[in-house]
A protein has these predicted regions:
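ABC family nucleotide-binding domain
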Residues: 5-8, 13-213
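H-loop (His-switch) and adjacent beta-strand-loop-beta switch element
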Residues: 213-222
Length: 222
Protein backbone atom coordinates (compact mmCIF):
# COMPACT_ATOMS: atom_id res chain seq x y z
CA UNK A 1 0.00 0.00 0.00
CA UNK A 2 1.42 3.38 -1.06
CA UNK A 3 1.16 6.33 1.31
CA UNK A 4 -0.20 9.50 -0.29
CA UNK A 5 2.31 12.36 0.11
CA UNK A 6 1.36 15.50 2.01
CA UNK A 7 0.53 18.50 -0.21
CA UNK A 8 3.05 20.46 1.88
CA UNK A 9 5.81 19.11 4.07
CA UNK A 10 8.79 20.84 5.67
CA UNK A 11 11.66 18.59 6.70
CA UNK A 12 14.31 19.81 9.16
CA UNK A 13 14.18 23.41 7.97
CA UNK A 14 16.82 25.79 9.29
CA UNK A 15 17.26 29.36 8.14
CA UNK A 16 19.99 31.81 9.17
CA UNK A 17 21.02 35.31 8.15
CA UNK A 18 24.26 37.26 8.44
CA UNK A 19 27.71 36.29 9.63
CA UNK A 20 29.81 36.71 12.74
CA UNK A 21 28.24 38.98 15.38
CA UNK A 22 25.34 39.71 13.01
CA UNK A 23 24.43 36.06 12.60
CA UNK A 24 20.75 35.40 13.29
CA UNK A 25 19.17 31.95 13.37
CA UNK A 26 15.53 32.42 12.31
CA UNK A 27 14.49 28.75 12.13
CA UNK A 28 16.09 25.75 13.82
CA UNK A 29 15.38 22.27 12.45
CA UNK A 30 11.63 22.81 11.98
CA UNK A 31 9.54 19.95 10.58
CA UNK A 32 5.87 20.22 9.71
CA UNK A 33 3.38 18.43 7.45
CA UNK A 34 -0.06 19.69 6.43
CA UNK A 35 -2.81 17.33 5.31
CA UNK A 36 -5.38 18.01 2.59
CA UNK A 37 -8.36 19.72 4.19
CA UNK A 38 -6.30 20.92 7.16
CA UNK A 39 -5.65 24.50 8.28
CA UNK A 40 -2.69 24.92 10.62
CA UNK A 41 -2.23 28.17 12.55
CA UNK A 42 1.27 29.36 13.44
CA UNK A 43 1.52 31.62 16.47
CA UNK A 44 4.38 33.02 18.51
CA UNK A 45 5.98 36.28 19.67
CA UNK A 46 7.42 38.83 17.28
CA UNK A 47 10.70 37.58 15.83
CA UNK A 48 9.94 33.92 16.51
CA UNK A 49 10.30 32.95 12.83
CA UNK A 50 6.63 32.77 11.79
CA UNK A 51 6.91 34.81 8.60
CA UNK A 52 10.24 33.21 7.70
CA UNK A 53 8.62 29.79 7.97
CA UNK A 54 5.77 30.88 5.69
CA UNK A 55 8.18 32.40 3.16
CA UNK A 56 10.22 29.20 3.03
CA UNK A 57 7.05 27.10 2.66
CA UNK A 58 5.90 29.37 -0.17
CA UNK A 59 9.25 29.11 -2.01
CA UNK A 60 9.74 32.85 -1.54
CA UNK A 61 12.89 32.32 0.50
CA UNK A 62 15.50 29.57 0.41
CA UNK A 63 16.27 27.69 3.62
CA UNK A 64 19.85 27.29 4.82
CA UNK A 65 19.21 23.56 5.18
CA UNK A 66 16.33 21.12 5.01
CA UNK A 67 13.70 20.38 2.39
CA UNK A 68 10.35 21.75 1.25
CA UNK A 69 8.25 19.00 -0.34
CA UNK A 70 5.29 19.73 -2.61
CA UNK A 71 3.23 16.56 -3.14
CA UNK A 72 6.23 14.55 -1.99
CA UNK A 73 8.71 16.13 -4.44
CA UNK A 74 11.50 18.34 -3.12
CA UNK A 75 11.28 21.95 -4.27
CA UNK A 76 14.22 23.20 -2.21
CA UNK A 77 16.82 23.10 -4.97
CA UNK A 78 14.77 24.69 -7.75
CA UNK A 79 16.26 27.74 -9.43
CA UNK A 80 14.39 31.04 -9.13
CA UNK A 81 12.44 30.55 -12.37
CA UNK A 82 11.31 27.01 -11.55
CA UNK A 83 10.45 27.99 -7.98
CA UNK A 84 8.24 30.83 -9.27
CA UNK A 85 6.51 28.47 -11.71
CA UNK A 86 5.89 25.91 -8.96
CA UNK A 87 4.54 28.61 -6.65
CA UNK A 88 2.13 29.98 -9.27
CA UNK A 89 0.76 26.53 -10.07
CA UNK A 90 0.50 25.01 -6.61
CA UNK A 91 0.67 27.71 -3.92
CA UNK A 92 -1.55 30.68 -3.16
CA UNK A 93 -0.04 33.28 -0.81
CA UNK A 94 -1.99 35.99 1.03
CA UNK A 95 -0.17 38.79 2.84
CA UNK A 96 -1.37 41.47 5.27
CA UNK A 97 -0.51 44.05 2.60
CA UNK A 98 -2.56 42.84 -0.34
CA UNK A 99 -0.16 44.31 -2.95
CA UNK A 100 -2.68 44.91 -5.71
CA UNK A 101 -1.30 46.57 -8.85
CA UNK A 102 -3.12 49.93 -9.04
CA UNK A 103 -3.00 50.18 -12.83
CA UNK A 104 -4.73 46.81 -13.29
CA UNK A 105 -8.42 46.16 -12.79
CA UNK A 106 -9.62 43.85 -10.05
CA UNK A 107 -10.13 41.10 -12.63
CA UNK A 108 -6.65 41.60 -14.08
CA UNK A 109 -5.09 41.47 -10.60
CA UNK A 110 -6.90 38.21 -9.84
CA UNK A 111 -5.95 36.63 -13.16
CA UNK A 112 -2.30 37.69 -13.06
CA UNK A 113 -0.89 34.35 -11.79
CA UNK A 114 -2.49 32.55 -14.73
CA UNK A 115 -1.47 35.23 -17.21
CA UNK A 116 2.17 34.88 -16.16
CA UNK A 117 1.90 31.28 -17.40
CA UNK A 118 0.33 32.45 -20.67
CA UNK A 119 -3.25 31.61 -19.65
CA UNK A 120 -6.17 34.03 -20.04
CA UNK A 121 -9.19 32.55 -18.26
CA UNK A 122 -11.97 35.05 -17.54
CA UNK A 123 -14.24 32.29 -16.28
CA UNK A 124 -11.69 31.30 -13.63
CA UNK A 125 -11.42 34.96 -12.59
CA UNK A 126 -15.21 35.23 -12.31
CA UNK A 127 -15.38 32.04 -10.22
CA UNK A 128 -12.65 33.25 -7.85
CA UNK A 129 -14.34 36.63 -7.38
CA UNK A 130 -17.70 34.96 -6.79
CA UNK A 131 -16.09 32.73 -4.16
CA UNK A 132 -14.96 35.77 -2.15
CA UNK A 133 -18.24 37.66 -2.58
CA UNK A 134 -17.03 40.16 -5.20
CA UNK A 135 -19.00 39.05 -8.24
CA UNK A 136 -19.20 41.88 -10.78
CA UNK A 137 -16.11 43.71 -9.48
CA UNK A 138 -13.98 42.66 -12.49
CA UNK A 139 -13.67 46.10 -14.09
CA UNK A 140 -13.16 48.18 -10.97
CA UNK A 141 -9.73 49.48 -10.00
CA UNK A 142 -8.12 49.01 -6.55
CA UNK A 143 -8.65 52.68 -5.66
CA UNK A 144 -12.40 52.18 -6.11
CA UNK A 145 -12.79 49.49 -3.45
CA UNK A 146 -12.41 49.34 0.34
CA UNK A 147 -9.49 47.82 2.24
CA UNK A 148 -11.57 44.79 3.18
CA UNK A 149 -12.62 44.30 -0.44
CA UNK A 150 -8.98 44.65 -1.55
CA UNK A 151 -7.99 41.86 0.84
CA UNK A 152 -10.75 39.71 -0.65
CA UNK A 153 -9.30 40.43 -4.11
CA UNK A 154 -5.91 39.23 -2.84
CA UNK A 155 -7.57 36.05 -1.59
CA UNK A 156 -9.27 35.52 -4.95
CA UNK A 157 -5.86 35.88 -6.60
CA UNK A 158 -4.50 33.21 -4.24
CA UNK A 159 -7.44 30.88 -4.91
CA UNK A 160 -7.44 31.06 -8.70
CA UNK A 161 -6.45 27.89 -10.50
CA UNK A 162 -7.57 25.52 -7.72
CA UNK A 163 -4.23 25.65 -5.93
CA UNK A 164 -3.81 22.91 -3.38
CA UNK A 165 -1.70 24.92 -0.89
CA UNK A 166 -2.80 28.21 0.69
CA UNK A 167 -0.48 30.30 2.87
CA UNK A 168 -1.68 33.38 4.75
CA UNK A 169 0.62 35.77 6.64
CA UNK A 170 -1.42 37.95 9.03
CA UNK A 171 -4.16 38.39 6.38
CA UNK A 172 -6.47 40.03 8.93
CA UNK A 173 -3.93 42.41 10.47
CA UNK A 174 -5.31 45.64 8.98
CA UNK A 175 -8.99 44.64 9.18
CA UNK A 176 -11.69 44.94 11.81
CA UNK A 177 -12.92 41.77 13.51
CA UNK A 178 -16.00 41.18 11.34
CA UNK A 179 -14.08 41.71 8.09
CA UNK A 180 -11.26 39.53 9.41
CA UNK A 181 -13.74 36.76 10.16
CA UNK A 182 -15.08 37.06 6.60
CA UNK A 183 -11.55 36.63 5.23
CA UNK A 184 -10.93 33.57 7.42
CA UNK A 185 -14.29 32.11 6.42
CA UNK A 186 -13.29 32.15 2.74
CA UNK A 187 -9.91 30.58 3.54
CA UNK A 188 -11.60 27.94 5.71
CA UNK A 189 -14.08 27.06 2.95
CA UNK A 190 -11.31 26.43 0.42
CA UNK A 191 -9.39 24.30 2.93
CA UNK A 192 -12.56 22.32 3.64
CA UNK A 193 -12.70 21.65 -0.11
CA UNK A 194 -9.34 19.87 0.09
CA UNK A 195 -6.56 22.48 0.14
CA UNK A 196 -3.77 22.45 2.73
CA UNK A 197 -3.50 25.74 4.63
CA UNK A 198 -0.97 27.56 6.81
CA UNK A 199 -2.08 30.67 8.70
CA UNK A 200 0.30 33.01 10.53
CA UNK A 201 -1.56 35.09 13.10
CA UNK A 202 -1.03 36.69 16.50
CA UNK A 203 -4.76 36.72 17.27
CA UNK A 204 -6.14 33.67 19.15
CA UNK A 205 -9.66 34.39 17.85
CA UNK A 206 -8.43 33.98 14.26
CA UNK A 207 -6.30 30.93 15.14
CA UNK A 208 -9.55 29.35 16.33
CA UNK A 209 -10.49 28.88 12.66
CA UNK A 210 -7.61 26.37 12.34
CA UNK A 211 -7.66 22.63 12.99
CA UNK A 212 -4.51 22.86 15.10
CA UNK A 213 -2.10 25.53 16.29
CA UNK A 214 1.70 25.41 16.37
CA UNK A 215 3.66 27.71 18.67
CA UNK A 216 7.03 29.02 17.49
CA UNK A 217 9.59 30.53 19.83
CA UNK A 218 13.16 31.45 18.87
CA UNK A 219 12.77 29.58 15.59
CA UNK A 220 11.69 26.30 17.16
CA UNK A 221 8.35 24.53 17.54
CA UNK A 222 7.36 24.42 21.21
Amino acid sequence: MTNTPFPLELQNISCAFGEGPRHVSALNNVSLAVNPGELVAIMGPSGSGKSTLLNVAGLLQRATSGHVLIDGASASDLNAKRAAETRRRHIGVIFQNYNLIPTLTVGENVGLPLELDGIIDREAVAIALREVGLEGFDNRFPEEISGGQAQHVAIARALIGSRKILLADEPTGALDTSTGDAVLRVLRQRVDSGAAGLLVTHEPRFAAWADRTIMLRDGEIQ
